[in-house]
Amino acid sequence: MKSLSLLALAAIAPPAAVAAVVDRQVPFENRPVQGLPEKFLIQLGPEQTRWVTEDEKWALKMEGVNFFDITAEPDRGFSAKSHERIQVSFPSEVKHQTELAPLLEQLSKDNMRQNLVHFTSFHTRYYKSETGVQSATWLFEQVEEAIQDSGAAQHAVKVERFEHSWGQFSIIATIPGRTNKTVVIGAHQDSINLFLPSILPAPGADDDGSGTVTILEAFRVLLQSEAVQQGNAANTIEFHWYSAEEAGLLGSQAIFSDYSKTGRDIKAMLQQDMTGYVEGTTKAGEVESVGVITDFVDPGLTEFIKRVITGYCTIPFVLTQCGYACSDHASASRYGYPSAFVIESEFKRSNQRIHTTGDTVDLLSFDHMLQHARMTLAFAYELAFAEL
């Protein structure tokens, strides 16, 4: 997710080990000259783009600079303003406390811990690595297992791979509703060690193993609702696990670009990226809370998220900002879809060990992750039955 500020990258970073795929639609004159480092077009703000090498991408992330990599986007020159923003009215109150009460009791910290320990055992989940494919395959199997164990497969609940030109695929699980109006919950499955991405370990426990297993647990429990799994909800629910977030939101961009082109009716998207670290907050003497992002998000959906947290979590929220293109919700916003993002704490108190070998499970709070799981489950259920 966010970038970690570290020093002296230039002195230690080697040339990139693997060249990224160049989109076939890039004009010949814009392709890199043979023998020179491959260049990528990144977008650092609504109207700001730049050509960089892969090593320069990682240097920017180390300096705390986030971006879209739009090299492979056919309409890469478009401004975010060119996609008309979808206007959605979200509920003014939460209404399903009775139905959600028994479901919330089924959320399991042990499940999240067990899944996260295994997920972080892969050497790296770097999007162009062999172990990145292996970790995605394992995650896909866990989603499949949740569907089979709940009996939801007989009601057309399904999980699919969304393939990319790099190795690691994204994952989309769909719970059909009575309409094609769709609510998306997302997290990114890849990890990165910014010092040597293709070589060094990248456990990525918090970034974003925590979000990955948080929404997996919410998905598992949501399928215990007969009304949901049998398709009686008003709206379709999708759970996404994105590839290649760390490389410039590549996986989520590809998905929401496809949704835009095919006319998908996406009513809301919630991102869960980094859900487990509280040490920064508690050491500062502050109250444990979740961080509601307020910049580059949909205001109406963000107000609804506040209602969900107040209604279903046992800790408060704080308002905070993370900047442009700081996680995959930005891809939904880029294509006009309402998006929101909730992180583990106020942004300045979030985990500073990400993108290194130090992003490990032992530093995380599963009690805190349970709060994010409660919020995610309640968000999905409330909007599944809402008139949007």
Swiss-Prot record:
Subcellular location: Secreted
Cofactor(s), names only, from the UniProt record: Zn(2+)
EC number: 3.4.11.-
Signal peptide: 1-19
UniProt-recorded Gene Ontology molecular function terms: aminopeptidase activity; metal ion binding; metalloexopeptidase activity
Cofactor: record remark: Binds 2 Zn(2+) ions per subunit.
Disulfide bonds: 322-326
Organism domain of life: Eukaryota
Coiled coil location: none
Listed InterPro entries: M28_fam, Peptidase_M28
GO biological process: proteolysis
Stated family: Belongs to the peptidase M28 family. M28E subfamily.
The protein's assembly and partners: Monomer.
Protein name as annotated: Leucine aminopeptidase 1
Species for this entry: Coccidioides posadasii (strain C735)
Lineage: Eukaryota, Fungi, Dikarya, Ascomycota, Pezizomycotina
Gene name, Swiss-Prot/TrEMBL: LAP1
